[in-house]
């Protein structure tokens, strides 16, 4: 959530940044009108309260006490009625504020959509092949690693069963990713895959992405779409010490997404699934630590890809493609030979104090005052897409797939 006082005092400037993030202008107009109306109604309430305070003190020495008592009684009714008006406006403002995204950092390039994202650098050279390459789903079915038919039978479309060496490779990747992240100083945590609504609000999934969530019927529980949600919220409504920061955590989880609006995209294979696995990085830190932490997390995920021998690139997201809670995001895209292009495999985001304000995560600063932390998150890595990348980049002419050297000890 944005700082509403800052938004009110700098509305035009912040509104321009929000427009760059495709916030509906009608919503911004409603927000502006609310600020104006709330300011007017608060001023009237303060006027009534000032009258009450002043003349309550004078009641004992007043010459016409009964008349003043009557005036104070009437004024008390005005205060109650006006307080109700102010409370209703503040509640409405709070609801609208939950639907307003984070503002982009000044370093984020302006752009309408993913076509205007900016490539920062490429890492490693994509492999060349002297034979006709196959797509991962064809390789997987031939090797009996991927069973799409039975996945659909027991669930529905966008579900797959991993088998044999495919399942072993997936498990090896999870273990390797966790070990790699831990070697970089990230503490391993294991969290529930079902969380309550307050937790979803804390990191910004609700109310904006309600249609993309799987909700448990007749219960206030949701399946997580990323372990960023429970891990960040581990510290909701807490005040941390400076000595505890930065917190660096890594977490494996299954993730669940309805993929609303993704009809027709990546319908074959396991690139876009309703259920997938991911190893996440999450950091909670002081504001003056967040830029260094962003670079540390980005380097961790990029170095992990490099250790697997996978060519990839760093892509700075433009304002129009930036996520709801993020102030800045760099995507890592891995090379897929069958598509002859790079595909997203990780997003590293700095959310600044946006999630911390929603989740009420604070620390005691040097002046002894409570200050909001900064939160960051990033995939290190998406397991299914890493599996896809290895299958395609390590395929051989006979249809077999070599296992990267760093993974062999996990088999």
Curated annotation (Swiss-Prot):
It catalyses: tRNA(Ser) + L-serine + ATP = L-seryl-tRNA(Ser) + AMP + diphosphate + H(+); tRNA(Sec) + L-serine + ATP = L-seryl-tRNA(Sec) + AMP + diphosphate + H(+). It is found in: Cytoplasm. The keyword Chloroplast does not apply. One of its GO terms (molecular function) is ATP binding. ATP binds at residues 257-259, 344-347. Its main location: cytoplasm. Coiled coil: none annotated. Its EC number is 6.1.1.11. L-serine binds at residues 226-228, 280, 379. Keywords: Aminoacyl-tRNA synthetase, ATP-binding, Cytoplasm, Ligase, Nucleotide-binding, Protein biosynthesis. CDD domains: SerRS_core (cd00770). One of its GO terms (cellular component) is cytoplasm. GO terms for biological process: selenocysteine biosynthetic process; seryl-tRNA aminoacylation. It comes from the Bacteria. Pathway: Aminoacyl-tRNA biosynthesis; selenocysteinyl-tRNA(Sec) biosynthesis; L-seryl-tRNA(Sec) from L-serine and tRNA(Sec): step 1/1. Homodimer. The tRNA molecule binds across the dimer. Consists of two distinct domains, a catalytic core and a N-terminal extension that is involved in tRNA binding. PANTHER family: SERINE--TRNA LIGASE, SERYL-TRNA SYNTHETASE. HAMAP family: Ser_tRNA_synth_type1. Belongs to the class-II aminoacyl-tRNA synthetase family. Type-1 seryl-tRNA synthetase subfamily. Catalyzes the attachment of serine to tRNA(Ser). Is also able to aminoacylate tRNA(Sec) with serine, to form the misacylated tRNA L-seryl-tRNA(Sec), which will be further converted into selenocysteinyl-tRNA(Sec). This is Serine--tRNA ligase. It comes from Campylobacter lari (strain RM2100 / D67 / ATCC BAA-1060). The gene is serS.
